């Protein structure tokens, strides 16, 4: 059995870690380096940093904090936001990131996924998918979600895009379930199940974790990793206790 991963997500805006609810009303959560160090020391398996404003504002991610994070932690980390070229990705990887994740830029230029996979290997290339469930239950891919003013439907359905990014060379998919984001009432298991069924690469669930049982429910579907933010930032769930709980439930977890 492959070891399941517990991942903390740090949304970055204007050099600080922030957190919103359903991708809106972001509140300050603290210093990037301090939080990265805290997670590294407290048993998290991996970190994902989303510069939530970079794509929307057409800015580059600051290489300075990426480099500082790399010096201060000893766990893998992934960086996302405004990565539009092989040059952008190369710089972030050179500054210490283990993986890069693309979202809106991949929707604008799907060939970017293939170019990055060829240049750096599929193991480095994560595709983030912001999936919104409408009132009829249709799953739609949104883009530029870092800012309410720019957030919009990309024209693609979630399941179509999941298939497409795999064909293009994505090494991993993070499914951000927008309706669940920050509300702490559990991952959307129905949506996760539908995506997992067509996923041939590692799948990470994001959006909705509120208690330990929510992680267990998601992992029971077969997914590879569960990502959370609010419950970890607010210390509502202790990472080490979560891992012991999951291990006691029979999952393969790194303690």
UniProtKB/Swiss-Prot annotation:
Q: What EC number(s) does its UniProt record assign?
A: 4.3.2.10
Q: Name one Pfam family in it.
A: His_biosynth
Chief place where the protein resides: cytoplasm
Pathway named in the protein's UniProt entry: Amino-acid biosynthesis; L-histidine biosynthesis; L-histidine from 5-phospho-alpha-D-ribose 1-diphosphate: step 5/9
> Which cellular components does GO assign to this protein?
cytoplasm
Q: Which GO terms describe its biological process?
A: L-histidine biosynthetic process
A single GO molecular-function term is:
lyase activity
Q: Does the keyword Nucleotide-binding apply?
A: no
Q: Which residues form the active site?
A: 11, 130
Q: Which InterPro entries match?
A: Aldolase_TIM, His_biosynth, HisF, IGPS_HisA/HisF, RibuloseP-bd_barrel
In terms of SUPFAM superfamilies, this protein maps to:
Ribulose-phoshate binding barrel (SSF51366)
Assembly and interaction partners? Heterodimer of HisH and HisF.
Q: Which PANTHER family match?
A: IMIDAZOLE GLYCEROL PHOSPHATE SYNTHASE HISHF (PTHR21235:SF2), IMIDAZOLE GLYCEROL PHOSPHATE SYNTHASE SUBUNIT HISF/H IGP SYNTHASE SUBUNIT HISF/H (PTHR21235)
Function of the molecule: IGPS catalyzes the conversion of PRFAR and glutamine to IGP, AICAR and glutamate. The HisF subunit catalyzes the cyclization activity that produces IGP and AICAR from PRFAR using the ammonia provided by the HisH subunit.
What the record says about family reads: Belongs to the HisA/HisF family.
- UniProt-recorded name of the protein: Imidazole glycerol phosphate synthase subunit HisF
Instruction: Please name the source species.
Output: Campylobacter jejuni subsp. jejuni serotype O:6 (strain 81116 / NCTC 11828)
Q: Source organism lineage?
A: Bacteria, Pseudomonadati, Campylobacterota, Epsilonproteobacteria, Campylobacterales
Which gene name belongs to this protein?
hisF
């Amino acid at each position: 059995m492959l070891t399941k991963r517990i991942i903390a997500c740090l949304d970055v805006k204007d050099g600080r870690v922030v957190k919103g609810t359903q991708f809106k009303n972001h509140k300050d959560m603290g210093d990037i380096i301090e939080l990265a160090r805290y997670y590294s020391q407290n048993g998290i398996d991996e970190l994902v940093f989303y510069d939530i404003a970079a794509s929307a504002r057409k800015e580059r991610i600051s290489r300075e904090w990426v480099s500082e994070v790399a010096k201060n932690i000893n766990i893998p980390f992934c960086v996302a936001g405004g990565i539009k070229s092989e040059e952008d990705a190369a710089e972030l990887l050179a500054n210490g990131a283990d993986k890069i994740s693309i979202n809106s830029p991949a929707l604008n230029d799907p060939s970017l996924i293939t170019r990055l996979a060829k240049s750096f290997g599929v193991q480095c290339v994560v595709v983030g998918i912001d999936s919104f469930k409408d009132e009829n239950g249709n799953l739609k891919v949104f883009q530029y979600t870092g800012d309410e003013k720019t957030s919009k439907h990309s024209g693609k359905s979630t399941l179509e895009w999941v298939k497409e990014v795999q064909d293009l060379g994505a090494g991993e998919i993070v499914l951000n379930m927008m309706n669940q984001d920050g509300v702490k009432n559990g991952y959307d298991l129905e949506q996760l199940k539908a995506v997992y069924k067509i996923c041939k690469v590692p799948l990470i669930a994001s959006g909705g974790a509120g208690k330990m049982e929510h992680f267990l429910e998601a992992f029971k579907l077969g997914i590879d990793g569960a990502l959370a933010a609010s419950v970890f930032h607010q210390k509502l769930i202790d990472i080490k206790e979560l891992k012991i709980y999951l291990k006691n439930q029979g999952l393969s977890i790194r303690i």
